[in-house]
Amino acid sequence: MKFIIKLFPEITIKSQSVRLRFIKILTGNIRNVLKHYDETLAVVRHWDHIEVRAKDESQRSAIRDALTRIPGIHHILEVEDHAYTDVHNIFEQALALYREQLEGKTFCVRVKRRGKHEFSSQDVERYVGGGLNQHIETARVNLTAPQVTVHLEIEQDRLLLIKGRYEGIGGFPIGTQEDVLSLISGGFDSGVSSYMLMRRGCRVHYCFFNLGGAAHEIGVKQVAHYLWNRFGSSHRVRFIAIDFDPVVGEILEKVDDGQMGVVLKRMMVRAASKIAERYGVQALVTGEALGQVSSQTLTNLRLIDNASDTLILRPLISHDKEHIIKQARELGTEDFAKTMPEYCGVISKSPTVKAVKAKIEAEESHFDFAILERVVSEARNIDIRQIAEQTKQEVVEIETVASFAPTDVLLDIRSPDEQDDKPLELDQIEIKSLPFYKLGTQFGDLDQSKTYLLYCERGVMSRLQALYLREQGFSNVKVYRP
């Protein structure tokens, strides 16, 4: 199989040296992502495109899907690569491939050509289009609004018959910009803002301030791992968890009620800045949007920024909530966010929308900053790829089974797309489908007299979800690993 990767247009307008660097980085990213699917896979870079060739036909759909989620790719062409002898031979090959697709449809032919030939692109379009029109009685030519466009590419002595075109996510390849640290809470905003910086070419590390115990941390780990696995798995990234309960306790005890929200955010920025400095990260990323909550007015945001010299990026600053939720839905993080509690908003009953710097500083003078230093020094840093292994250690009480009893129910928690690609077919056991992002809200509706064996492809999400359900009080869960 062969795929032609077309570059994001902004890459093509860069200077020659920058363009070559971007293409080289994108080629490496593609290799890193796809090596898990086919060890014999080849990735070859060219000036205006990248070729991906693989032998394992069973991985075709998985490879194609992975390519559509790699930043820097504008679109992917799935092609058949053949030799040709002349224009008539090009027509014959196009007829064999497109006959069924064109029956009863209007169509046009579009040709791109590279190299020196005795014919022009228009010559091929006219000859192939005329031939298809003559040989397929129910097909009709329509050059302005065709139902089917026959795409052909001719490269020197090779003919590329384009079987399908699939849109990528665009943006810059990860690694072309500097690293950032995303303050992730698991809600709608932080997930979308993290994705937006990945799409713009940044390697995004994650910093989580734990205010809700083990269940909260597991939930946020799921979101971070999902985002990384789906859009950023070409690079190793860090997940840093900071136990912020002592800081919140100090704020509740020492700070005036109306100033608590701004002070808490300033403490988070200070802590995250120390983490960023420790790992050489250039900027923080937050999901704040102007006026969304009391701490996100211009006055308050300015005071929050002043707590540190580290640059703070807010990609959602002008977005409204409806748009953010729509983006989260498209990314697949909406259902995570729906079940994620918002802890930051509960500590202040009458938050100020226009904090005064002198008053904030006066309130912070009562705060014991040794507590902040301590929680930062105790921050836990893990490679996000180790979340699976860490979960194994945390979930020692979760039983992993390779077989099942007749009364067990196998719960397929993979995404609907994964279930469609590789449906489970097992005898002597009831199989139910409940995607992982719906477990938090719908598991309680299942028959709790039965034992549920959670299944996912690699066992990462099933272990995370098993721990999460145990934290919620459900003891009738196991992990199924055949």
Curated annotation (Swiss-Prot):
Pfam families: ThiI, ThiI_fer, THUMP. It is found in: Cytoplasm. It is an enzyme of class 2 (transferase). Residues 61-165 form the THUMP domain. PANTHER family: TRNA SULFURTRANSFERASE (PTHR43209:SF1). GO terms for molecular function: ATP binding; CCA tRNA nucleotidyltransferase activity; tRNA binding; tRNA-uracil-4 sulfurtransferase activity. It catalyses: [ThiI sulfur-carrier protein]-S-sulfanyl-L-cysteine + a uridine in tRNA + 2 reduced [2Fe-2S]-[ferredoxin] + ATP + H(+) = [ThiI sulfur-carrier protein]-L-cysteine + a 4-thiouridine in tRNA + 2 oxidized [2Fe-2S]-[ferredoxin] + AMP + diphosphate; [ThiS sulfur-carrier protein]-C-terminal Gly-Gly-AMP + S-sulfanyl-L-cysteinyl-[cysteine desulfurase] + AH2 = [ThiS sulfur-carrier protein]-C-terminal-Gly-aminoethanethioate + L-cysteinyl-[cysteine desulfurase] + A + AMP + 2 H(+). Pathway: Cofactor biosynthesis; thiamine diphosphate biosynthesis. CDD domains: PPase_ThiI (cd01712), RHOD (cd00158), THUMP_ThiI (cd11716). It comes from Pectobacterium carotovorum subsp. carotovorum (strain PC1). Its EC number is 2.8.1.4. This is tRNA sulfurtransferase. The active site is at 456 (cysteine persulfide intermediate). ATP binds at residues 183-184, 265, 287, 296. It comes from the Bacteria. The keyword Cytoplasm applies. Belongs to the ThiI family. Residues 404-482 form the Rhodanese domain. NCBIfam families: ThiI_C_thiazole, tRNA uracil 4-sulfurtransferase ThiI. GO terms for biological process: thiamine biosynthetic process; thiamine diphosphate biosynthetic process; thiazole biosynthetic process; tRNA 4-thiouridine biosynthesis. Keywords: ATP-binding, Cytoplasm, Disulfide bond, Nucleotide-binding, Redox-active center, RNA-binding, Thiamine biosynthesis, Transferase, tRNA-binding. The gene is thiI. Catalyzes the ATP-dependent transfer of a sulfur to tRNA to produce 4-thiouridine in position 8 of tRNAs, which functions as a near-UV photosensor. Also catalyzes the transfer of sulfur to the sulfur carrier protein ThiS, forming ThiS-thiocarboxylate. This is a step in the synthesis of thiazole, in the thiamine biosynthesis pathway. The sulfur is donated as persulfide by IscS. Disulfide bonds join 344-456.
